[in-house]
């Protein structure tokens, strides 16, 4: 199911009129095109097909930390900006290091809830690696919360984990490792 850019353009023009703007005035004339192109880019994750190649690995924890992402909140269609940290314990093989950020991009390129995004990344990493031992921590600023309503710039942190990461000492080891890559240090 692709993006219907013509319908988006028509809807954006109607929104501009509904808020008292003239969609034909200078500065807004190309806004419907820009919004349609933006939404096409930011919601094409369902079309992503990440190919995985497995390599010889070890049984030690693999961590990819500080993966920057942006996605749109499905409630307000406003951006969430954040970082994701992923760890897994290989069963005996590992996937290429670039594949984990690709998984993050795949699921962030659709309308999202942060908690669902975190679970989807965990499940895809588990499926791709064949590991039942995966942990994902996602931190994000929600612009819907920053610019409207409560107007708070507090980030949301969500975690999903399974397998050996149910052991709190392993979670703490992961959290200690990713500390330098956490959102408050990484996006500033």
From Swiss-Prot:
GO MF terms held by the record: GTP binding; GTP cyclohydrolase I activity; zinc ion binding
Record's keyword annotation contains Metal-binding: yes
InterPro entries: GTP-CH-I_C/QueF, GTP-CH-I_N, GTP_CycHdrlase_I, GTP_CycHdrlase_I_dom
Any one GO CC term of the record: cytoplasm
Catalytic activity: GTP + H2O = 7,8-dihydroneopterin 3'-triphosphate + formate + H(+)
Pfam families xref list: GTP_cyclohydroI
EC number: 3.5.4.16
One GO BP: one-carbon metabolic process
Pathway assigned to this chain's UniProt record: Cofactor biosynthesis; 7,8-dihydroneopterin triphosphate biosynthesis; 7,8-dihydroneopterin triphosphate from GTP: step 1/1
Keywords: GTP-binding, Hydrolase, Metal-binding, Nucleotide-binding, One-carbon metabolism, Zinc
Binding site for Zn(2+): 73, 76, 144
Record has Hydrolase as a keyword: yes
Subunit structure: Homomer.
Assigned protein family: Belongs to the GTP cyclohydrolase I family.
Protein name in the entry: GTP cyclohydrolase 1
Gene this chain is encoded by: folE
